[in-house]
UniProtKB/Swiss-Prot annotation:
<keyword id="KW-0963">Cytoplasm</keyword>
<dbReference type="GO" id="GO:0006310">
    <property type="term" value="P:DNA recombination"/>
</dbReference>
<dbReference type="InterPro" id="IPR013849">
    <property type="entry name" value="DNA_helicase_Holl-junc_RuvA_I"/>
</dbReference>
<dbReference type="GO" id="GO:0009378">
    <property type="term" value="F:four-way junction helicase activity"/>
</dbReference>
<keyword id="KW-0233">DNA recombination</keyword>
<dbReference type="GO" id="GO:0048476">
    <property type="term" value="C:Holliday junction resolvase complex"/>
</dbReference>
<comment type="subunit">
    <text>Homotetramer. Forms an RuvA(8)-RuvB(12)-Holliday junction (HJ) complex. HJ DNA is sandwiched between 2 RuvA tetramers; dsDNA enters through RuvA and exits via RuvB. An RuvB hexamer assembles on each DNA strand where it exits the tetramer. Each RuvB hexamer is contacted by two RuvA subunits (via domain III) on 2 adjacent RuvB subunits; this complex drives branch migration. In the full resolvosome a probable DNA-RuvA(4)-RuvB(12)-RuvC(2) complex forms which resolves the HJ.</text>
</comment>
<dbReference type="InterPro" id="IPR010994">
    <property type="entry name" value="RuvA_2-like"/>
</dbReference>
<dbReference type="Pfam" id="PF07499">
    <property type="entry name" value="RuvA_C"/>
</dbReference>
<dbReference type="GO" id="GO:0005737">
    <property type="term" value="C:cytoplasm"/>
</dbReference>
<dbReference type="InterPro" id="IPR011114">
    <property type="entry name" value="RuvA_C"/>
</dbReference>
<dbReference type="GO" id="GO:0000400">
    <property type="term" value="F:four-way junction DNA binding"/>
</dbReference>
<dbReference type="GO" id="GO:0005524">
    <property type="term" value="F:ATP binding"/>
</dbReference>
<feature type="region of interest" description="Domain II">
    <location>
        <begin position="65"/>
        <end position="142"/>
    </location>
</feature>
<feature type="region of interest" description="Flexible linker">
    <location>
        <begin position="143"/>
        <end position="156"/>
    </location>
</feature>
<feature type="region of interest" description="Domain I">
    <location>
        <begin position="1"/>
        <end position="64"/>
    </location>
</feature>
<keyword id="KW-0234">DNA repair</keyword>
Length: 205
């Protein structure tokens, strides 16, 4: 199993990043809350990974630290929650925000996440609350959220950031029409792709 990658960031195409380690390029799917904190292109990054093997694909999911990965691994154990939905959940909320929402039983906040209906939200609260008791670390005893950094350079800006941002939202589980509407609501000329995605997800909550 691939549990950790250390290498150079070659490409960023939310929510995927291409990282080269020892001459091999790895495509890694990351929650947007983790994606925002990646270094610039051509710089070194360390990513903790979870490897998923399916009949039709082998996928790597990446995180900035072990606690975020542990949360993802617990999420995909919940009935009805697969890796794609877990990725969408942790893109719509930071790991700390999600833990807080579950602890406070904020069903209304959870159902605003893509792919999460009332039944799934209720299941998340019931099952994840118990799972948190077996996990250690500051993340699982949240006090307040940590502001996210979202570095962006001219290299990482897309020629059409609005289209790229909408495509990223679709990859996270939003319908194309809904994704376009979300981006159009917060679009502004100077915003890059990562900023548009972050603002659209925040506005949806």
């Amino acid at each position: 199993m691939i549990g950790r990658l250390r290498g150079i960031i070659l490409e960023k195409q939310p929510p995927q990043v291409l990282i080269e380690a020892n001459g091999v390029g790895y495509e890694v799917h990351m929650p947007m809350t983790c994606f925002y904190e990646l270094p610039e292109l051509n710089q070194e990054a360390i990513i903790f990974t979870h490897f998923v093997v399916r009949e039709d694909a082998q996928l790597l999911f990446g995180f900035n630290d072990k606690q975020e990965r542990a949360l993802f691994r617990e999420l995909i154990k919940v009935n009805g929650v697969g890796p794609k939905l877990a990725l969408a959940i942790l893109s719509g909320m930071s790991a700390t925000q999600f833990v807080s929402a579950v602890e406070r039983e904020e069903i209304g906040a959870l159902i605003k996440l893509p792919g999460v209906g009332k039944k799934t939200a209720e299941r998340l609260v019931v099952e994840m609350k118990d799972r948190f008791k077996g996990l250690s670390g500051d993340l699982f005893n949240p006090v307040s959220d940590i502001p996210l950094a979202s570095p962006a350079s001219a290299e990482s800006r897309a020629s059409d950031p609005e289209a790229e941002a909408a495509a990223a939202l679709v990859a996270l589980g939003y319908k194309p029409q809904e994704a376009s509407r979300m981006i159009s609501k917060i679009a502004r000329p100077e915003a890059d792709c990562e900023t548009l995605i972050r603002d659209a997800l925040r506005a949806a909550l």
